[in-house]
C-alpha cells in the first residue's frame, strides 16, 4: 500500500503536467459565414504545440516521376499519399492538419480532389483554400497541396546529472 501511494504521489504531477500541455484545437463555423463543405472557416490551436509546415506536394512518386499525367483522380491520390508520408515523417497525421492550401489547374475536376481529400481526411475539416492557377511548376502537374499541422509538443527528457 505504501509503495502504491508513493508511486501515485510521484506520478500525479507528471500526469497533470501532461494534460496541461495537450494542445486544444477548436474548429468554428461562425453563423455569419456560409456553411462550409469539407473545411472549417476558423481553426484555433492553443497550448504548447509543435507546428509542422508541409511544402506543396505534387503528383511525383518517390523516384521523381509524374503519376497520372492528364488524370486528376490519379494525381490527387498521389498528392494525398505524399502529404501522408510528409506528415508521418514529422510525427503527424491528417487528424493534426489545421490548414490546407490547394492549387489546381482545372477547377472542373474539383470532385476528384474532394474524393481524394475525403478518403484521406475523413471527418477532419481543416481551414482550407482552393485556388485555380494557370499552371504549376511543371506543365503536366494538375494539383499541388500544402498543409500546416499542429501536434502536442513532446516532453523533453533530460538525462540525470551524475
Say what each PLM segment does.
Residues 4-16:
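Bacterial N-terminal signal peptides
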Residues 2-5, 19-162:
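Short, polar/acidic, helix-capping and beta-turn segments at strand->helix junctions
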Amino acid at each position: 500500500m505504501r509503495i502504491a501511494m508513493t508511486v501515485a504521489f510521484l506520478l500525479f504531477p507528471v500526469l497533470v503536467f501532461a494534460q496541461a500541455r495537450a494542445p486544444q484545437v477548436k474548429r468554428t463555423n461562425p453563423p455569419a459565414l456560409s456553411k462550409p463543405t469539407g473545411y472549417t472557416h476558423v481553426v484555433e490551436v492553443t497550448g504548447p504545440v509543435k507546428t509542422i509546415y508541409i511544402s506543396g506536394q505534387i503528383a511525383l512518386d518517390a523516384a521523381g516521376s509524374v503519376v497520372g499525367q492528364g488524370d486528376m483522380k490519379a494525381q490527387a491520390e498521389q498528392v494525398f499519399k505524399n502529404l501522408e508520408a510528409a506528415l508521418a515523417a514529422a510525427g503527424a497525421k491528417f487528424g493534426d492538419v489545421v490548414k490546407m492550401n490547394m492549387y489546381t489547374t482545372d477547377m472542373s475536376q474539383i470532385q476528384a480532389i474532394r474524393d481524394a481529400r475525403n478518403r484521406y481526411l475523413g471527418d477532419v475539416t481543416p481551414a482550407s483554400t482552393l485556388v485555380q492557377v494557370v499552371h504549376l511548376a511543371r506543365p503536366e502537374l494538375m494539383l499541388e497541396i500544402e498543409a500546416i499541422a499542429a501536434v502536442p509538443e513532446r516532453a523533453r527528457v533530460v538525462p540525470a546529472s551524475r
